[in-house]
């Protein structure tokens, strides 16, 4: 079974990246098992390999990290749950198909949102999970991955209760029309992060 590793405090992006890469190397050389890291980050803007400089509007003294994942700019911070699976798509009956893997990550989020009667959707020609509300379409989760020798790293970020104002420092995912939301904003109440993490763990093992 894939090892589930939960970090109990917001960590720097660079620390999480080192953990992912170390686990990936261990899987490749046979010294480590597959793992999922679930955590929150300290405030950071991350830029994927497709990010453009003019998509960073105002960093608000928030650190900026350029990464090797797919995608453009996004924000990570406390109140946003991050899932970083480091798993082998060539093993355990999985499919060596990146699009299928990204779709499975979206399904994980969509299934978890059902516990709160929130209907998550995917949108053609975009990556991530969205919701349709009376105020229009809003993004609730971002997905950005990289695959090395069919081993995955990076992953998905789900807005539970982050400071949504901090998304205004970037053009999220390169789309000026993107409006972000969170579970707490949609419910107009706080949910317990540990409860939500337990849901994600349950739903992850159903898919992967």
Swiss-Prot record:
GO terms for cellular component: cytoplasm. The active site is at 173 (acyl-thioester intermediate). The keyword Transferase applies. Keywords: Acyltransferase, Cytoplasm, Transferase. The record marks 139 as: Lowers pKa of active site Cys. GO terms for biological process: protein modification process. Substrate binds at residues 69-76, 142-144, 155-157. One of its GO terms (molecular function) is lipoyl(octanoyl) transferase activity. It catalyses: octanoyl-[ACP] + L-lysyl-[protein] = N(6)-octanoyl-L-lysyl-[protein] + holo-[ACP] + H(+). Residues 30-208 form the BPL/LPL catalytic domain. Pathway: Protein modification; protein lipoylation via endogenous pathway; protein N(6)-(lipoyl)lysine from octanoyl-[acyl-carrier-protein]: step 1/2. The keyword Acyltransferase applies. Its EC number is 2.3.1.181. It is found in: Cytoplasm. Catalyzes the transfer of endogenously produced octanoic acid from octanoyl-acyl-carrier-protein onto the lipoyl domains of lipoate-dependent enzymes. Lipoyl-ACP can also act as a substrate although octanoyl-ACP is likely to be the physiological substrate. Belongs to the LipB family. This is Octanoyltransferase. It comes from Orientia tsutsugamushi (strain Boryong) (Rickettsia tsutsugamushi).
């Amino acid at each position: 079974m894939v090892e589930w590793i939960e970090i109990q405090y917001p960590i720097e992006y660079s620390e999480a990246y080192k953990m992912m890469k170390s686990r990936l190397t261990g899987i490749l050389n046979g010294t480590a098992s597959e793992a999922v890291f679930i955590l929150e980050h300290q405030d950071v803007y991350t830029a994927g390999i497709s990010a453009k400089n003019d998509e960073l509007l105002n960093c608000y003294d928030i650190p900026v990290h350029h990464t090797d994942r797919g995608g453009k700019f996004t924000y990570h911070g406390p109140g946003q749950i991050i899932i970083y699976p480091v798993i082998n798509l060539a093993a355990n009956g999985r499919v060596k198909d990146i699009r299928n893997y990204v779709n499975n990550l979206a399904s994980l989020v969509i299934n978890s949102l059902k516990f709160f009667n929130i209907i998550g959707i995917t949108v053609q020609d975009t990556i991530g999970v969205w919701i349709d509300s009376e105020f229009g379409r809003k993004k609730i989760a971002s997905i950005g991955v990289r695959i090395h020798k069919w081993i995955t790293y990076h992953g998905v970020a789900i807005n539970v209760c982050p400071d949504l104002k901090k998304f205004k420092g970037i053009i999220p995912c390169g789309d000026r029309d993107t409006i972000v939301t969170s579970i707490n904003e949609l419910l107009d109440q706080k949910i317990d992060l540990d409860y939500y993490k337990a849901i994600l763990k349950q739903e992850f093992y159903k898919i992967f």
